């Protein structure tokens, strides 16, 4: 093995702006399979850490793969530090997690990482389920989010259903959802972006609520009728990219929503069941 050791000059290590921890598929455009190209389109470098590796989403007639073993998962995280690839790290994002033990491992890694990066932005998309499907992750994941990841996050991006699960509060109207989001805020958790706040079905609108301790901003977007998967992952990728490029939170949320709409319409025009990224018009 020693004869294969070529790269031990850590001063030459490739550096990341973002570490993205979430699912990966061989076929399709969900999780890091859509987030990584979207982030790179924004001129940012990202390292992808998979939590599950799947052939495709379960919405096809065949489906293979599963959660990454804990030993591998912890090794992926540890290797980034062993390669000295995190000197310029600015943010860590999380999406679909395979197991509660992964969440605990990730939280321990983030806690240690923050000692060297006190300004690190940690953004958690607490993927648990949705109103139509209910909980579609393992039943011990919601408590793992509450116990391990929420205390570390500066921002989270739940949908209405996930907000209900995390808070134990009914969130089916906008005021109750905002109140529930505010109940999660802390000295660490500065903002909650509710990605499916109550919209106007008749006017074909959907709403995103940006909630912080001193403000609430509700952003409306056109509703696109589609079964496309991965739009939430794309939204989070665009949001973190906007924040790292210096956009204010409300502006970054607004621009992320517009980009998702653009991608969805572009995908529909190309008659694809999987998201297709058009060129990024704005630098």
Swiss-Prot record:
Binding site for substrate: 23, 59, 233
Catalytic activity: pyridoxal + ATP = pyridoxal 5'-phosphate + ADP + H(+); pyridoxine + ATP = pyridoxine 5'-phosphate + ADP + H(+); pyridoxamine + ATP = pyridoxamine 5'-phosphate + ADP + H(+)
Xref: SUPFAM superfamilies: Ribokinase-like (SSF53613)
GO cellular component: cytosol
Enzyme Commission (EC) number: 2.7.1.35
GO BP terms, alphabetized: pyridoxal 5'-phosphate salvage
Subunit description: Homodimer.
NCBIfam families according to UniProt: PRK08176.1, pyridox_kin
PANTHER family registered for this protein in UniProt: PYRIDOXAL KINASE, PYRIDOXINE_PYRIDOXAL_PYRIDOXAMINE KINASE
Protein name listed in UniProt: Pyridoxine/pyridoxal/pyridoxamine kinase
């Amino acid at each position: 093995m020693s004869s294969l050791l070529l790269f031990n000059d850590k001063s030459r290590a490739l550096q990341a702006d973002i570490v993205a921890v979430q699912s990966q598929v061989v076929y399709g455009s969900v999780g890091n399979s859509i987030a990584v190209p979207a982030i790179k389109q924004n001129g940012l470098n990202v390292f992808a850490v998979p939590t599950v590796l799947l052939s495709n989403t379960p919405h096809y007639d065949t489906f293979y793969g599963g959660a990454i073993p804990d030993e591998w998962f912890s090794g992926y995280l540890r290797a980034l530090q062993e390669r000295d690839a995190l000197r310029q790290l600015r943010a860590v994002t999380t999406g679909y997690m395979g197991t509660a033990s992964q969440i605990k491992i990730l939280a321990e890694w983030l806690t240690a990482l923050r000692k060297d990066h006190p300004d690190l932005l940690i953004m958690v998309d607490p993927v648990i389920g949705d109103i139509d499907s209910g909980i579609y992750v393992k039943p011990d994941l919601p408590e793992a989010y509450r116990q391990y990841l929420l205390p570390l996050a500066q921002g989270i991006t739940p949908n209405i259903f996930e907000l209900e699960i995390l808070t134990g509060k009914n969130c089916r109207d906008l005021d109750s959802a905002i109140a529930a989001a505010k109940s999660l805020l802390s000295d660490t958790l500065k903002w909650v972006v509710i990605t499916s706040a109550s919209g106007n079905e008749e006017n074909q609108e959907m709403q995103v609520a940006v909630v912080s301790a001193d403000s609430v901003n509700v952003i409306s977007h056109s509703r696109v009728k589609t079964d496309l998967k991965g739009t939430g992952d794309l939204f989070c990728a665009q949001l973190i990219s906007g924040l790292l490029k210096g956009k204010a939170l409300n502006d970054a949320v607004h621009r992320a929503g517009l980009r998702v709409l653009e991608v969805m319409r572009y995908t529909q025009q190309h008659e694809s069941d999987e998201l297709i990224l058009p060129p990024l018009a704005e630098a």
